[in-house]
């Protein structure tokens, strides 16, 4: 690249910044990109033909797009003013340095969108479960579906987060107390992000599978497993056991996988009681009232929602509106 103070701005210089420099260029982050790079914005920069003139308008678009990317991420870059038509285009310092910084921080997001809570189906088991000291399992399945594999990529690349949470407050059996403690106190909220490294999103740190709250120490917490690490077969990303005898065999577990050729995230949550709690105790639990949105009833419930990326500095919500379908068995 010939781009330097006192030199002429050539088409190859501009094209490198816009789309041809490996890794650190505008279009790989702003446009379709590949894998964990790309916000899916349609307003990418056109290249200039070899030997062509780079106009002030084109240069301004480049400067403004770098600013938008950095602002979306919260990346600090060099302050610069976009040129205007009719003025001499001066060489601006540290353009490639700033692009490299933005590429390194491509998974970060300074803000977040509003929580989506309009899941469909059933997320709570309102009838009682178990009989005496017999083993039982409640299975909650949540399927998040995007319109395309690219839409799913854009969601995670731009800072989208999947949120998992559970609750149970119903009473009436000996086992209810410990199950309520497990679901409401020991288990925290679980967030699933892209997972290719640590992302700073809306001021929080996320690594793929991130636990927020909850006093329990899980036997499994796949901290570095996120969307890009999942397979089409189940991976256990979280498992928390109860902590009070004789119920320490009870647990809540989350398995995650992709489906639909990269268009779906499937979370299968199991509440498991192995039975055999012994004399003076029981393994059956109460049902209760149903959950709606993120307003929990009293029944055993597992809810999956999401926070889409912020569009404050982007031009479009390229990830669309993913749906969340819930079942319980």
Q: Each PLM stretch: what is its role?
A:
Residues 172-186, 260, 280:
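Long, acidic (Asp/Glu-rich), low-complexity accessory segments flanking structured domains
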Residues 1-129, 133, 137, 268-270, ...:
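Extracellular "spike/adhesin" assembly and maturation modules
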């Amino acid at each position: 690249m010939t781009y330097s103070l006192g030199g002429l701005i050539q088409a190859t210089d501009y094209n490198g910044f816009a789309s041809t420099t490996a890794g650190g260029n505008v279009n790989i982050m702003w446009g379709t990109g590949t894998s964990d790079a790309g916000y899916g914005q349609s307003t990418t920069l056109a290249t200039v033909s070899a030997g062509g003139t780079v106009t002030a308008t084109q240069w301004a678009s480049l400067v403004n797009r770098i600013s938008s990317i950095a602002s979306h991420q919260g990346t600090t870059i060099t302050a610069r003013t976009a040129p205007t038509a009719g003025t001499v285009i001066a060489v601006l310092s540290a353009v490639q340095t700033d692009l490299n910084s933005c590429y390194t921080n491509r998974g970060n997001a300074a803000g977040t969108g509003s929580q989506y809570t309009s899941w469909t189906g059933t997320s709570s088991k309102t009838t009682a479960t178990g009989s005496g000291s017999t083993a039982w399992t409640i299975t909650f399945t949540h399927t998040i579906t995007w319109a395309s594999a690219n839409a799913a990529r854009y969601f995670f690349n731009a800072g989208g987060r999947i949120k998992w949470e559970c609750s149970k407050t119903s009473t009436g059996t000996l086992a209810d107390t410990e199950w309520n403690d497990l679901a409401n106190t020991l288990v925290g909220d679980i967030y699933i992000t892209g997972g290719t490294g640590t992302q700073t999103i809306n001021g929080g740190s996320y690594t793929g599978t991130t636990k927020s709250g909850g006093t329990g120490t899980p036997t499994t917490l796949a901290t570095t497993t996120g969307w890009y690490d999942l397979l089409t077969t189940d991976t256990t990303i979280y498992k928390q056991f109860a902590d009070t005898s004789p119920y320490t065999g009870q647990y809540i577990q989350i398995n995650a996988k992709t489906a639909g050729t990269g268009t779906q995230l499937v979370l299968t949550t199991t509440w498991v009681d192995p039975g055999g709690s012994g004399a003076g105790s029981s393994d059956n639990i109460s049902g209760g009232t149903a959950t709606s949105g993120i307003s929990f009833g009293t029944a055993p419930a597992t809810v999956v929602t999401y926070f889409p990326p912020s569009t404050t500095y982007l031009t479009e919500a390229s990830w669309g509106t993913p749906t969340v379908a819930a079942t319980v068995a």
